[in-house]
Amino acid sequence: MEDRLTATGARRSNPISGPEQFAEAFKVPRETIHGLIRYAELLTEGQTRANLVSTKTLPQLWDRHFADSAQILRLAPDARVWLDLGAGAGFPGLVIAILQANHANFVMHLVESTAKKCAFLAEVARATSAPVEIHCMRIEELSKSATSLKPDIVTARALAPLPHLLELAAPWLKSGARGLFLKGRDAGKEIESAKRRFNFTCHLHPSMTAEDSFVLEISHLAKRVKAKTR
């Protein structure tokens, strides 16, 4: 299988400063915006108890975190089963779950090993009726029972360099799931490094929220087989 790399998509010029701009940009109904507003409130409150996100990013919450997460949905609007690895404070998984709450049979699996963050995710899910299942464990533990979980999409944000990320996601990507991973300015270098371990198809979608960032769409993952030497 040959590696294939393409770049598609367009960036949005104006940052999203609040719920009204978010609703306009993503065509979101009022009740969904109310859920995101509640999420924002709980995140601000929770930040005083646990280090959920970088405090300096809170003033740009709607653009830096919410819009950055929501942009992934345009690449898989009909996917019903998602898996967010290293969910942290819920980006991108919890945002997508809130946006898709009214879609039948939708579920977002959130994997997070830190108990305080799991408690926060559960609090937001209750407050917003987000269709999520929280797995408070290490990704490696969940992957041992990977056959019982069959996601359409595997996603992650700021979790690990791509070679390690693909190792973590491999149990699901090798079973046919697509990967949608948010990456920054080093995306190209990470792809080249990952190619030393894996064969895969990769589409680069320019981020809507940052000029030097991308969404990597990865499929057809297979481990590279080293040629035998005589």
Model-flagged regions — what are they?
Residues 2-79, 83, 116-131:
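Class I SAM-dependent transferase core
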Residues 43, 96, 183, 218:
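Residue-level signal for inorganic ion chemistry
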Residues 70-156, 166:
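Conserved SAM/SAH cofactor-binding pocket of Class I
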Residues 92, 171-173, 197-198:
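Glycine-rich, phosphate-binding/catalytic loops in enzymes
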Residues 117-119, 162, 187:
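Short alpha-helix immediately C-terminal to the canonical SAM-binding loop
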Residues 134, 184-230:
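Active-site capping/gating segments
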Residues 166-176:
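A short glycine-rich, Lys/Arg-flanked "PGG" loop and its adjoining helix->strand segment in the class I
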Residues 176-186:
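Conserved beta-strand signature within the Rossmann-like core of class I S-adenosyl-L-methionine
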